Regions:
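PLP-dependent aminotransferase-like
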Residues: 64-168, 175
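Hydrophobic/aromatic ligand-binding patch that stacks against planar heteroaromatic rings
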Residues: 86-88, 180, 260
Length: 399
């Protein structure tokens, strides 16, 4: 049997809904996208959501709406995918990378606090693997540093402190302290890429908390303008009889979601609670199997105060370096089991080396990376395949 890491779970209902969208005559941003936005907002317990073509676009447009640019600093983790930091570069701001805490996937919050300056305008925590970060601690830090905050836009001034923008690409459906991811950070970006728990092939969504003195509809409209060339009407509004005329408010960007993408998402969202439950079952099987294996360390996806979305099953192999880790990956592949690594820290990548970052300054992030292997975890994985992964993984590590 060949076992992939994370294929999309697309069934006949998704296919039927896409066909219906194609037959409807409306395939770009339209009624299905608007309905998907409403359902995402309801699911996340927020007032509004906006759907775009990627989580990357969601984060970048948020930074642009905040007025963050050259001369500003944005803090994020060194242990993440490039999208988290690249959007900071896109707007001309300076990324400030923080090492992880010892033995953790989250930023070292003491180092994060010490990195805050008068130029710091936002912090982007990363909810890696689907586990929500400690936002209580993050908010405690940004609230304690209000005195040094220097807003440079009306929205920043209304927020009144450093903005917290969650990179929750992995964490749609996760919870912490009974609060749904999407209703915790000031702004929350989700990914619906093909490998994610809920997919629209490509795509993403953004939710946000109310800002005192700022109308939610105004915020939604700004995201519409930013994502559709600054056009005052979307394609759906322009098709209304006699409503052809529009204005271009600003020379903006093009990153809207289509109704074909939303058609997939609407069905995926109907199935999502069952998909999350299956992921929890699979994680339970892995956890129980590896509990007796003292060389394998795993994440705590579920606890008294949190429930993960179960997006990735990260393992760490004790007393293992990169060379042996990579050899294990090859040997798993020889048995037709695909695995992955999440993530190679950004300071090890050429782009970030060129920005002056050096992995020697991020020893904890490197320690998390050097012996990490991500095992298959997806809702098409059968119990038999899961047992095959477990038995082979333990066998290979033991020899």
């Amino acid at each position: 049997m060949k076992i992939p890491v994370s294929p999309p779970d697309i069934g006949p209902q998704e296919i039927e809904e896409v066909i219906a969208a194609l037959h409807s005559g409306w395939i770009t941003t339209g009624p299905r996208t608007k309905e998907f936005e409403k359902q995402i907002a309801a699911y996340c317990h927020t007032e509004r959501a906006v759907c775009l073509n990627s989580a990357t676009a969601c984060m970048e447009l948020t930074l642009r709406l905040l007025g963050i640019g050259p001369g500003d600093e944005v803090i994020t983790s060194a242990y993440t995918y490039t999208a988290t930091a690249s959007v900071i570069c896109h707007v001309g701001a300076q990324p400030v990378l923080i090492d992880t805490a010892l033995g953790s996937l989250e930023m070292d919050y003491e180092k994060m606090a010490n990195a805050i300056t008068e130029r710091t305008k936002a912090i982007i925590p990363v909810d890696l693997a689907g586990i929500v970060c400690d936002y209580d601690k993050i908010y405690g830090i940004v609230n304690a540093r209000k005195a040094c905050f220097r807003p440079s836009s009306p929205l920043q001034e209304a927020i009144g402190r450093i903005t917290v923008l969650a990179d929750a690409a992995h964490a749609f459906g996760a919870e912490r302290h009974g609060r749904k991811c999407g209703s915790i950070a000031d702004f929350t970006s989700f990914s619906f890429h093909a490998v994610k728990n809920l997919t629209t092939a490509e795509g993403g969504a953004l939710t946000w908390l109310p800002v005192a003195g700022i109308d939610n509809e105004w915020l939604y409209k700004q995201f519409q303008l930013l994502s559709l060339h600054g056009q005052s009407k979307d394609a759906l509004a322009k098709t209304q009889l006699g409503s052809w005329e529009y204005d271009i408010i600003a020379p903006n960007y093009k990153c809207n979601m289509t109704d074909i993408m939303a058609a997939i998402g609407l069905v995926q969202l109907q199935r999502y609670d069952r998909l999350l439950a299956r992921r929890r079952e699979l994680i339970g099987k892995y956890d129980r199997a590896f509990k007796a294996c003292d060389t394998i360390e795993v994440l705590a996806h579920y606890g008294n105060d949190h429930a993960s979305s179960g997006h990735l099953y990260l393992t760490r192999i004790k007393d293992t370096d990169e060379k042996r880790r990579n050899d294990i990956i090859v040997r798993m592949a020889e048995r037709d089991i695909a695995t992955n690594v999440h993530y190679k820290p950004l300071p090890m990548m050429t782009a970030y080396k060129n920005l002056g970052f050096d992995i020697v300054d991020f020893p904890h992030a490197y320690a998390m990376y050097r012996n990490e292997i991500t095992l298959p975890l997806h809702t098409r994985l059968t119990d038999e395949e899961t047992e095959y992964v477990i038995s082979n993984y333990i066998d290979i590590i033991s020899h």
